[in-house]
A protein has these predicted regions:
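A short glycine-rich, hydrophobically flanked beta-strand micro-motif that places a catalytic Asp/Glu
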Residues: 74-79, 168-184
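An exposed, glycine/acidic-rich loop-and-rim segment of catalytic or binding clefts
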Residues: 113, 123-131, 138-146, 223, ...
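Phosphate-binding core of ATP-grasp and ATP-grasp-like enzymes
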Residues: 113, 118-130, 161-172, 197-202
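Active-site loop/lid in soluble adenylation, ligation, and acyl-transfer enzymes
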Residues: 2-124, 235
């Protein structure tokens, strides 16, 4: 279906959002801009926008096939996708399978510890406050979501983790941790939104433990473009 792109509604760190001729559909346009540490570090990863767009769409289509509702509608070009217009629930959901990043620092443990079961964390999606960690009781107190919505978000998040770990294991990648965002459609349905990419996931090569994600930019390791391309190459080869 053809969607006429209208005015820009929003511009974030990694994407722009445009209205369309359909009031229930918006167009997401992925940028090459890269940020870390809540926007304190800024740069560019050449080609990132196109890779993240295609990878997100590929994975969301697979998740839909397995029963996880998403905002995905139609891939329009290498950088643009039509998605359902949603009201984002201001909770970032972090699932962790292996210790790394802020988890390792917060609890004083080494990176690379494989957990017996995945952990789940929430953070309040608020740049001005630095996206502070919160629990479900905080979310209820602040009326960010209802108990039923929180329960459903947790159910979907763990389901996404199980499925993504399987997808990544087939291509020799460990899914270390990742961030999800959910939104509500016009009729109140909770769906997976935002993106699934090396911007939002920690991905390590299963054999070498080489980092294949935004940590390469975040930690000034170099090779971010090549890492993103490698994940995409493996994922597309698994079709």
């Amino acid at each position: 279906m053809a969607y006429e792109k209208l005015e820009q509604l929003y511009e974030g760190k990694a994407k722009k959002v445009f209205a369309t001729s359909d009031p229930n559909v918006v167009i997401v346009s992925y940028k090459d801009d890269a940020t870390a540490f809540n926007g304190l570090k800024k740069g560019t990863i050449t080609g990132k926008g196109a890779i993240n767009n295609r990878m997100t769409n590929n994975l969301m289509r697979r998740l839909e096939e397995k029963g996880v509702p998403t905002h995905y509608v139609e891939e329009l070009s290498d950088r643009e996708t039509a998605v359902k217009k949603v009201s984002i629930v201001p909770l970032e959901v972090i699932i962790r399978n292996i210790s790394a990043g802020s988890f390792a620092k917060r609890f004083g443990v080494e990176e690379g510890i494989v957990f017996d079961a995945p952990t789940i964390e929430f953070s309040y999606k608020n740049d001005d406050l630095g996206d502070p960690l919160m629990n479900s009781y905080h979310a209820l107190a602040l009326k960010l979501a209802t108990q039923e919505e929180i329960d459903l978000i947790k159910k979907y998040a763990f389901a996404v983790n199980d499925l993504l770990r399987g997808f990544m294991k087939k291509i020799g990648i460990d899914l270390v941790d990742f961030k999800l965002e959910f939104g509500k459609t016009s009729d109140g349905t909770i769906v997976l939104a935002d993106e699934i990419s090396p911007d939002t996931c920690r991905l390590w090569d299963e054999q070498t433990h080489e980092k294949l994600d935004k940590d390469r930019f975040r930690r000034d390791m170099g090779g971010a473009e090549e890492a993103y391309e490698e994940v995409m190459r493996r994922l597309m080869g698994d079709q």
